[in-house]
Amino acid sequence: MELGVLLLLTFTVGFLLLLASQNRPKTHGHLPPGPRPLPFLGNLLQMNRRGLLRSFMQLQEKYGDVFTVHLGPRPVVILCGTDTIREALVDQAEAFSGRGTVAVLHPVVQGYGVIFANGERWKILRRFSLVTMRNFGMGKRSVEERIKEEAQCLVEELKKYKGALLNPTSIFQSIAANIICSIVFGERFDYKDHQFLRLLDLIYQTFSLMGSLSSQVFELFSGFLKYFPGVHKQISKNLQEILNYIDHSVEKHRATLDPNTPRDFINTYLLRMEKEKSNHHTEFHHQNLVISVLSLFFTGTETTSTTLRYSFLIMLKYPHVAEKVQKEIDQVIGSHRLPTLDDRTKMPYTDAVIHEIQRFADLIPIGLPHRVTNDTMFLGYLLPKNTEVYPILSSALHDPRYFDHPDTFNPEHFLDVNGTLKKSEAFLPFSTGKRICLGEGIAQNELFIFFTAILQNFSLASPVAPEDIDLSPINSGISKIPSPYQIHFLSRCVG
């Protein structure tokens, strides 16, 4: 459904739902200031047509780093700036550890799974997931070994193209997905596997749709738009198809389950289900399993692959940066072995470039919504229990109080005067606090090895001149996606 039709529908039926909204429970407490809302419509008139992110950044200029907006009929507290976000998610971590609702995903996830659960369910699932992923990441085949094996497959695959022009989207999706698949499903897939490619396409479609303006309008008025056609229906359809695959995989795991040798996340979860089958209140049931696997598969694939796509688009835009990275690679690693994680500390410029790519790309500008778990005093305001809170991660990644030129790509943001890697409290691409991304460590390891392995083995070329390359994202709502592009990977000859 087109955005204009959605908005017309909103205004047309708004007065009907205004009657229903009068029955909603009134909030107590003292929320931060913000623009005056209209009944039911909330702050729709203050929303920028270019999306929620642009709207929030404009409101920050007027109201400061903490303010309230009404997304349709519901109040949401917006947190901007590094210090404010860290004050909430780190200093008052427990109070802000609840998970808010993502309307376009809720019909499928319904508060299940490690990412979208709340309360004891979330604590139990997160503890289990952290331990399980750590065990499979640090066991006989560590995550580093898995990534290095995948990097070798990647290099061999790119060499098959012999420098021909290609769109790197599919292959970057494949390598990222194979790492999380090896941990969750216990297997990797061939890059040409049709079922695998179908799953990756569904993930890519869904991530793109979530960043669309229509999806953002749905977040405002999901209460009645859910009854009409729109992007939310397509998102649910896509996710259900992925869930069907996960269900099938779970049944295969169940049929071959060996209690003595669990080989992946699903096996380990099934064993825990069996152990707790007499507990009628257990959180280890089928629904939490499949939604947890869906969440890990989705986030473990799309964020890393999109970062890699941005990485090489940026390198095409700034070829002098790529050349400087390659010089460091040649000095530290050479050409006769793959990069290892131990190399990272000896390669501060490369590490700084990867940090700056993540900062500049800003893939998830509006972090997943939080919810306060109790009535909470925050910076002089009283947030009632269950108040939704949006941390605007983009406002930290582009915080002028921490980065001299926040809107410019500059690896020097992460280097001190001695050329050593410089940490920054504003570096929050994975959020922070108790809800920080489960796979942060794995993702950082993937980015270093994949990025370095490619530049070790290939020079880059584009049919577009560097000055004409556009780094602007397609969407700038709850996700940012680079425009599709073509690239040559040309084999390097290094002595």
Curated annotation (Swiss-Prot):
Its main location: endoplasmic reticulum. Its cofactor is heme. Heme binds at residue 437. It catalyses: an organic molecule + reduced [NADPH--hemoprotein reductase] + O2 = an alcohol + oxidized [NADPH--hemoprotein reductase] + H2O + H(+). GO terms for molecular function: arachidonate epoxygenase activity; heme binding; iron ion binding; oxidoreductase activity, acting on paired donors, with incorporation or reduction of molecular oxygen, reduced flavin or flavoprotein as one donor, and incorporation of one atom of oxygen. GO terms for biological process: epoxygenase P450 pathway; xenobiotic metabolic process. Keywords: Endoplasmic reticulum, Heme, Iron, Membrane, Metal-binding, Microsome, Monooxygenase, Oxidoreductase, Phosphoprotein. Its EC number is 1.14.14.1. Gene3D superfamilies: Cytochrome P450. The keyword Metal-binding applies. It is found in: Endoplasmic reticulum membrane; Microsome membrane. It comes from the Eukaryota. GO terms for cellular component: cytoplasm; endoplasmic reticulum membrane; intracellular membrane-bounded organelle. The modification Phosphoserine is found at residue 129. It is a peripheral membrane protein. PROSITE patterns: CYTOCHROME_P450. Belongs to the cytochrome P450 family. Cytochromes P450 are a group of heme-thiolate monooxygenases. In liver microsomes, this enzyme is involved in an NADPH-dependent electron transport pathway. It oxidizes a variety of structurally unrelated compounds, including steroids, fatty acids, and xenobiotics. This is Cytochrome P450 2B15. The lineage of its organism: Eukaryota, Metazoa, Chordata, Craniata, Vertebrata.
